[in-house]
Amino acid sequence: MNLKNKKAICIMSGGMDSTLGAYMVKEMGYEIVALHFNYAQRTEAKELFCFKKICEALNVSNSYVLDLDFFSKIGASALTDKSIDIPINGLEEGVPITYVPFRNGIFLSIAAALAEKEEAVLIAIGVVQEDSSGYPDCKDSFITSMEQSINLGTKDETKIKIYMPLVHLSKSQIVEHALRLNVPLELTWSCYKDEEAACGVCDSCRLRLNGFRLANAKDPIEYM
């Protein structure tokens, strides 16, 4: 395929996974349209700051920041409801309280609308199934079904592929890939709790730190 002038919508949280995904898309030759969501998450300001810095590093000229504050009205997640404590005692069985109901389904639906507007042929999302916190909307089967639904519910001439390059990687493999591509991991943020220094004890911090440990690499961000 000739990728000249081919656009990809990259859903970017400011985290390590979605940032690596964007760098992989750039390496493939796509023009990146960066998409970030403020969804009333605890670390909203830090994630937005990181997103903007990463866009600068990628030389992205076309970006969107969309506010989805209705997530706080839905609640039911420790990420969007501050009355619910962020778990700090390690990963547990089942779906954790940090799961935001159907977040990725909503993100992908909005990304599809933007893809139609921008005439993009790819949506990139940094979901990780194997080494994640057990979120149901990070499954390969779910993302594949969303791709089918998006193509059924858009114009006939719209053909969108959802790219999920990390879905079957472990966190250590993600770190290794990111280091090979010179991804600026110092600009990324994973912590669920804090915005100054990462807490080091929430599920997301634990997964990130373990990934660096297994990859025999040093995490460049600051921890408490």
UniProtKB/Swiss-Prot annotation:
Catalysed transformations (reactions): 7-carboxy-7-deazaguanine + NH4(+) + ATP = 7-cyano-7-deazaguanine + ADP + phosphate + H2O + H(+)
InterPro entries tied to this protein: QueC, Rossmann-like_a/b/a_fold
Keyword tags: ATP-binding, Ligase, Metal-binding, Nucleotide-binding, Queuosine biosynthesis, Zinc
Enzyme category, top tier: ligase
SUPFAM superfamilies cross-referenced by the UniProt entry: Adenine nucleotide alpha hydrolases-like (SSF52402)
Single GO molecular function: ligase activity, forming carbon-nitrogen bonds
Pfam families for this protein: QueC
Pathway(s) served: Purine metabolism; 7-cyano-7-deazaguanine biosynthesis
Regions annotated as coiled coil: none
Binding-site residues, ATP: M12, S13, G14, G15, M16, D17, S18, T19, L20, G21, A22
GO biological process, one term: queuosine biosynthetic process
Residue numbers binding Zn(2+): C191, C199, C202, C205
EC number: 6.3.4.20
Annotated cofactor note: Binds 1 zinc ion per subunit.
Cofactor: Zn(2+)
Domain of life: Bacteria
Annotated family: Belongs to the QueC family.
Known role: Catalyzes the ATP-dependent conversion of 7-carboxy-7-deazaguanine (CDG) to 7-cyano-7-deazaguanine (preQ(0)).
This protein's name: 7-cyano-7-deazaguanine synthase
Lineage summary: Bacteria, Pseudomonadati, Campylobacterota, Epsilonproteobacteria, Campylobacterales
